[in-house]
């Protein structure tokens, strides 16, 4: 009986030891994730995991996994193993190739940035309800499922094949960029009360855009589309508006934009531009339109004006004493008045019909191109930078009938060969 008792005790001890060893192994498997090629077969993913192994023991502890709240992956082809990092709040994937992944595991995700091709042509973010920032650049993306009720503040979509995008449920959006999506022909961003920055550019068949009633909007960029209709009523706080290269745009109403400082509307078919309510304007780019007149008497802070290639016959910038750069070539101008504009450093007015040009009050002038006019004399004696240029730079007569002196991009002077230059 005694021996039987001892054997029983020994057997119990052995069993307990085995159980202890077995439980320890389970605990270890639960607590650690090996950083190896089996778990992370892609080289880029493997290196990303190694970067999270802070104690360099080739394992990821629970603490290391939980502390990984952001990850950057560049050039991966396989995202296998990413789901190990369950606490991620920010994921950035760049230069990915033929990727496919389900992001539903990341319930804490707040920021997602994807750049690359997506093999499934579909990205489903319906489970990521905490997302605040989404940026997707994927040239073969045809379907995007957004999370309902997510507190989105920033959204960027570029180079996709989507035919449209509906963001009307996300009224908290502050910044939206929709660029180079060739299948979109109409977009509506009306009634976004928090929207501050909107870029909708280089969408080559985009014909209609509604941006009305966005009271906080300050920056609007709609360059390089095919717009014929642009509704920006109810956006009275716009400070910067760029709508260049929309070849079907024939009108532009900026009367409500009293805070406007920058207006770039070049390469359109705009016939008239009323700036009488834009006293803060400092930069105006309106070249290659159909303007027959341009009233600048209400823009005293204007510093830069580029109105080349319009149908202007006269131009008066004398009400703009702050102007430094003026380009008005190829406009059929017979009159150009910039009296009192003593701060001008660059004047480009070639190929017009000017018979006189007085720059004696422009002591800082360093860039003057005035060839192709009807000038007989040119007095540069009060412009020391131009006088010095003629003394130090080589004379270039390669362009027939014209003389040019050039000092890199610093100074330039060009005039007709047969005029008298007073220096």
Language model segments and positions:
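Canonical leucine-rich repeat
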Residues: 79-82, 99-103, 121-125, 134, ...
């Amino acid at each position: 009986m005694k021996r039987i008792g001892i054997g029983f005790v020994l057997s119990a001890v052995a069993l307990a030891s085995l159980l202890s060893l077995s439980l320890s192994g389970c605990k270890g498997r639960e607590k650690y994730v090996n950083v190896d090629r089996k778990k992370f077969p892609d080289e880029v993913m493997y290196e990303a995991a190694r970067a999270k192994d802070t104690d360099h023991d080739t394992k990821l502890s629970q603490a290391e996994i939980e502390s990984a709240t952001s990850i950057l992956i560049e050039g991966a082809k396989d995202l296998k193993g990413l789901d190990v990092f369950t606490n991620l709040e920010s994921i950035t994937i760049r230069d990915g190739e033929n990727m496919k992944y389900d992001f539903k595991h990341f319930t804490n995700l707040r920021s997602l940035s994807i750049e690359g091709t997506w093999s499934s042509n579909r990205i489903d973010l319906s489970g990521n309800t905490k997302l605040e920032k989404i940026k997707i650049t994927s040239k073969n993306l045809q379907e995007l499922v957004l999370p309902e009720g997510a507190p989105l503040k920033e959204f960027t979509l570029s180079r996709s094949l989507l035919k449209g995008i509906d963001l009307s449920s996300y009224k908290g959006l502050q910044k939206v960029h929709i660029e180079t999506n060739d299948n979109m022909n109409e977009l509506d961003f009306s009634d976004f009360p928090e929207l501050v920055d909107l870029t909708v550019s280089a969408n080559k068949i985009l014909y209609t855009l509604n941006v009305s009633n966005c009271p906080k909007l300050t920056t609007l960029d709609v360059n390089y589309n095919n717009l014929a209709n642009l509704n920006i009523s109810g956006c009275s706080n716009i400070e910067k508006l760029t709508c260049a290269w929309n070849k079907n745009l024939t009108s532009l109403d900026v009367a409500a934009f009293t805070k406007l400082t920058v207006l770039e509307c070049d390469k359109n078919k705009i016939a008239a531009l009323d700036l009488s309510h834009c006293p803060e304007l400092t930069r105006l780019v309106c070249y290659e339109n159909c303007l027959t007149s341009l009233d600048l008497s209400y823009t005293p802070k204007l510093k830069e004006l580029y109105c080349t290639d319009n149908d202007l016959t006269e131009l008066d910038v004398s009400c703009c004493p702050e102007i430094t750069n003026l380009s008005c070539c190829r406009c059929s101008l017979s009159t150009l008045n910039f009296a009192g504009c003593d701060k001008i450093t660059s004047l480009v007015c070639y190929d017009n019909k000017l018979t006189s040009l007085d720059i004696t009050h422009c002591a800082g002038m360093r860039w003057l191109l005035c060839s192709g006019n009807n000038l007989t004399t040119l007095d540069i004696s009060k412009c020391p930078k131009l006088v010095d240029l003629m003394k130090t730079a080589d004379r270039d007569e390669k362009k027939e009938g014209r003389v040019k002196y050039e000092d890199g991009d610093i100074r330039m002077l060009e005039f007709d060969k047969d005029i008298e230059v007073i220096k």
